[in-house]
Each structure stands twice: as structure tokens, then as C-alpha cells.
């Protein structure tokens, strides 16, 4: 909203014109979210400790996790608050793509909050019943998918971009809604599954959001979009502001979530961040790119699917424990080693994903 104020003030002082530059707003969006998160962290942690809102730890999990019992959770509230305030300050309020992401971020944040509340306040280890969680995730995702389809149905916004092939961009039509639904819900739950170690989920989220910031900038620039053979989407540029806000809020949260964590994000953070990343990927027409850059989330999810499927079909487990990060813990890897190695893999996958934009 400060952009509109700056457009008015530029009549009196030309220096306010700097607010119209996307690169400037991207930088200050990151810094704003980072500062808010760093400021809010100690206050939120102290408040959660006062309310005794602590993490519930599985009794069948790694023994090293027992010491985490009671660590404040629902720290994702600081992430959501930081992102929302930063985006509202620095993005154009008239941009429909921005509102689609915020709708998912806040909507999934509410679902996650209810789940966390039932777990840590009402001491219900199962939290929100799975079918109700999936129901509300579906309703919110479908509402966003219909909105996104209505915005872009007559533009390249409903084309499917296939990596490595510049001339293969099938028009999805109404199938766009179905694809958007699965990407949003799937990514939300994938990030949620990954959030099992200190800092494990937030850093890959930061990497992927940073990668999408570059993609959004290119997609919203007619010259670079043509150069990379990706659809030009005039609303896409403002998603840079959203992505950098996620990066800033994520780094601020990591300050308190790094090993040994002072706070966990909880479902209020993981479901919301995953949903936001999925929505950004759909809006940019880069669902396949999300699979590559978010490969850590994909592998974590597949490990759970394979583990459950193998046990039901053969009565045997593939991994010592799923998601796969627990498998490595039970193999004797120290938690920091698992975390940092997953970070390195995530960064590599983001760089590989960005490289595919040119390899066509």
C-alpha cells in the first residue's frame, strides 16, 4: 500500500519514484519481513512459554527428540504475520496474484492453527481429524484455483510449461483447476511432513521461494520471458515481493529455529508455507519446476507413501522410520548433519531447477 502513497508523493518529490522499482521493493520486502520476524520472535516465544504451548513428541520417535518435548510451537504465527505485513506494505494491492497467495497463506494458516491448538492446548495428540483437515484444505484450494482460473483463462496463464521443451505448452482449460488443487494441497502437506527437525523445513522453503522470486521476475518481464521461452504474465512481477517476503520471514524464523530450536513453526507455519509455494508455482505455470526445486519435499513425501504402502502390502518397512529424515537419525546421523545435508541438497536442486529454464 505504500506504493500508492509513493505515487501520490512523487508529485512533490521525485525521489519517491524509487518505490516504483520492483528490485527496490523486493529488497525492502525481504528486510521488512526479516526485521518483523526477528522483533516478534522473542515476544512470541515468551508468550507461548507462559501459556505452556509446547511441542508434543511421539513416543515411538528417535530418543533424541524426547528433549524437544515442551519446546514452544506455533511459531509459524511470526512467519505468517511478517509475510502478510511486508506484502501489504510493498506489493501493489490491485494485483490479483498477490491476493491469491495471501488467501492460501492465511487460509491454510488458520487450518494449521486449529490443528496445533487441538494438539498443544487441548492435549489431543492427533490434532484436527485428518478428514476434516483435508476437507478444509480442499475447500480453500478449490476456491483459490477457481479464482486463478477466472483471472487467467484467456491468457497463457493456463498453459502447462514442460521443462526442456520450449514448444510443448498444452492449454489445460478447466484441467487447470484440478492441477492447481493437487499442487497446492500436495505441496502444503509435503512441507508439513518435512517439518520434523530443527530448521529442516524452513531453509528449503527459503531456497525455493528465492528461486521463484527470480522466475517471477523473468515471467513478468516481456523480454526475459521471450528469451527463456516461458509464458509472459503481466501480473507475475509482483510475486517477487511475495517470494522475498517469504525469504525474509523464513530467515528471521530460522534465527530461533536453528538447532537446538527455541521454537517450532507447527502446522500453522508448515501448511501455510507449503500452500503458498504451491500457489506461486501454479500462478507462474511452473509446477514441474516446483517438483525439481522442492525435491526435498517430494522425497520426504514419497518416503511416507512408500513406507505405508510397503507395510500394508508386504508387512515390511522400507525405512527404519518415515519421513526419511528420521531414517537417517536412526542410522546414527546427528540431527545437525541430517539438517545441513538436506539443506545442501535443496540448494543444489534449486540451482538445477533454475538451469532448466535455459536448457530448452
Curated annotation (Swiss-Prot):
Its EC number is 2.7.8.13. CDD domains: GT_MraY. The chain crosses the membrane at residues 26-46, 72-92, 94-114, 132-152, 168-188, 199-219, 236-256, 263-283, 288-308, 338-358. Pfam families: Glycos_transf_4, MraY_sig1. It is a multi-pass membrane protein. Keywords: Cell cycle, Cell division, Cell inner membrane, Cell membrane, Cell shape, Cell wall biogenesis/degradation, Magnesium, Membrane, Metal-binding, Peptidoglycan synthesis, Transferase, Transmembrane, Transmembrane helix. Its main location: membrane. Pathway: Cell wall biogenesis; peptidoglycan biosynthesis. Signal peptide: none annotated. It is an enzyme of class 2 (transferase). One of its GO terms (cellular component) is plasma membrane. Its cofactor is Mg(2+). The keyword Oxidoreductase does not apply. It comes from the Bacteria. GO terms for biological process: cell division; cell wall organization; peptidoglycan biosynthetic process; regulation of cell shape. GO terms for molecular function: metal ion binding; phospho-N-acetylmuramoyl-pentapeptide-transferase activity; UDP-N-acetylmuramoyl-L-alanyl-D-glutamyl-meso-2,6-diaminopimelyl-D-alanyl-D-alanine:undecaprenyl-phosphate transferase activity. The keyword tRNA processing does not apply. NCBIfam families: mraY (TIGR00445). Catalyzes the initial step of the lipid cycle reactions in the biosynthesis of the cell wall peptidoglycan: transfers peptidoglycan precursor phospho-MurNAc-pentapeptide from UDP-MurNAc-pentapeptide onto the lipid carrier undecaprenyl phosphate, yielding undecaprenyl-pyrophosphoryl-MurNAc-pentapeptide, known as lipid I. Belongs to the glycosyltransferase 4 family. MraY subfamily. This is Phospho-N-acetylmuramoyl-pentapeptide-transferase.
